[in-house]
Amino acid sequence: VLPPAGSIPIQQQQVRERSLVPLEPLFSLEPQQLLQRSDSVELQFDWPRSADDPRELSEIPELRLWSLRADALCPWLPLLLERSSGQLTRHVAMLLPHSFSRSEGIRFAPDSLELWMTHRLFLLDHWSRGHGLNCRGNLEQMAAVLGFELDGSFWNGLS
């Protein structure tokens, strides 16, 4: 069972071992149940840092490696991550090259974002449709949050 409010604590040892045990409650959910959790899951990394460590979480190699593994084995995870607090953006920052500025926030390398986002759109659309579900609206919202402009004809010709 997931903790209340969709918060998933990820302990330091689990990160070091690249253990996905914290995500296991999601593995048993049917696709429809997963989609019902869209925009509601928060990953809470318990990763101690000294007060003078200026790095963002996405700059910590161990957290990036854990996130890469989670993304590879749970390709639907970005759909579930909460968007308004930056959970989705932080997760994608763990996966893709990016820069950060105080005025603009995270800016993804455009080619990397386009490749990852297009791949993820195809993958999750196929996955959801294979289960008789449609999550295109949700995928479009996810893309918009990441600053990826989806052409209106993107879905044309895809069954």
Task: Please report, for each region that a protein language model flagged, where it lies by residue.
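Short, structured motif recognition centered on aromatic/hydrophobic residues
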Residues: 64-70
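Residues that form ligand- and interface-recognition hot spots within folded domains
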Residues: 47, 70, 85
